[in-house]
Amino acid sequence: VGMVLSTTNALIGYICNLTIGKKNYENVQDEVIKIKEEANKLKTKALNVIDEDSKVLNKVLKAYKIRKDEPEKLEEASKDSVLFCNEVMEDSLKTLKLVNRLEKVGNRMLASDFKICKKYALSSVESSIVNIDINLKYVQDKEFKEKIKNNYLKKYEEAKKI
């Protein structure tokens, strides 16, 4: 998910670069520059997700091996993984919102890039939800599970409307 999210934000930066300094877009330069800065931060964070994901997964795999002796370790590791994936989902939704903002002011010649960005960002939201669901299977805390599931269902509905 991190790779797709970083690629999406790089593509947003590409669109911004092809909008900034263009005569037909002089009146939206400040907005496009802000979008580019936000996308750059999200891209950097997403690149870190790639490395962090393996650490989170290793913790879950280690806990899974000892789950019979120490079930609380699997619960903790699974919750950590759920929270990690939830944060990635939130960043994916932020990216989708950035694309939506940029689509209103960005270079019209890049219509296909806007559509690709939206598909990638929505895919990142959906992929994060898949990861959340898989890890929720190992969480016993029903209140935690319900809170997380309600959150991602709400966010997914929001994402599909963009």
Regions found by a protein language model. Give the residues of each.
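Amphipathic alpha-helix face/heptad-repeat signature
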Residues: 3-7, 35, 42-49, 81-91, ...
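Inter-helical turn/loop segments and adjacent helix faces that build the functional surface
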Residues: 19-26, 102-111, 135-147
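Amphipathic alpha-helical interface segments
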Residues: 53-123, 135
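A structural-propensity feature for long, helix-poor, extended segments
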Residues: 20-62
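Conserved phosphate/anionic-ligand binding catalytic regions in large, soluble enzymes, centered on
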Residues: 1-13, 110-128
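Long amphipathic all-alpha helical oligomerization modules
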Residues: 122-161
